[in-house]
Amino acid sequence: MTGLALVTGASSGIGREYARRLAAQGVSLIAVGRRRERLDELAAEFPEVIVRPVVADLATRDGIEQVVAAVADQPVTMLVNNAGVAHYRAFAELPPEQAAELVGVKVLAPTLLTRAITPGMIARGGGRIVNVSGMIAFSGPASLEQVPLRRAVYAASLAHSVALSQTLHAELSPHGIHVQALCPGVVATEFHERQGMDLSAAPRMSAADVVTASLRGFELGETVTAPGVEQNDLLQRVFDADLAAFGGQSPQLATRYRS
């Protein structure tokens, strides 16, 4: 495999593993993260591959614009929108700056970075885009007894990744561009520890397995890849229900709402 991949959140976890996997296959990298020393270590690990470190905070508009400038006129063949942050707090107690950080990193940054590289992919006739989401994107209907995490903004931001991926895939697949929402469960990385959460007792998947599933998901033609879901028809039933609800609408007021 050759080409140029833009990987965000490449300092650790899934992003670092994805960057390492691609570099091992000869793919050049634009590696984005907030920790310069981690990005330099990544570059030193693959001296035979071009690895361009970009230190940027994607929670800020300046950080996003910095990365957009870094990829301007670059022939990006793959984008991995992996950068993430999680703030599990009761909604009424979530500091506004943390809510803004979540939306910036998981909604605004992936949207604008994808917008930046899409015209080039269309012109070149193909590409791959990965939006790293999570199974918690599907947890909206769950009660706090079922899922005790206070997660409203976080779950909503990941649900955005799924919807963006599905609708973009429909729009861009005629141009040879495959868009994938990658939805793991709990992963054995630094991610939750850096948010002050101890999930050491929880069953966790390795970042390596998550990346393996993503790459295999492209081969299988999946738009939503869930590494830990054995029965793929479970997800298909969710999507079929979405389409049934969308198709079941009418301009007439539903009977249950009539007095």
Language model regions located:
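A short, exposed helix-loop element centered on a Lys and neighboring polar residues
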Residues: 114-115, 166
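Catalytic loop of short-chain dehydrogenase/reductase
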Residues: 130-160, 166, 170-173
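Conserved NAD(P)H cofactor-binding loop of Rossmann-fold oxidoreductase domains
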Residues: 82-88
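C-terminal helical subdomain
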Residues: 181, 197-237
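Substrate-binding pocket helix/loop in short-chain dehydrogenase/reductase
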Residues: 90-92, 98-101
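Conserved glycine-rich cofactor-binding loop
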Residues: 11-12
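Conserved glycine-rich Rossmann-like NAD(P)H-binding loop of the short-chain dehydrogenase/reductase
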Residues: 25-41
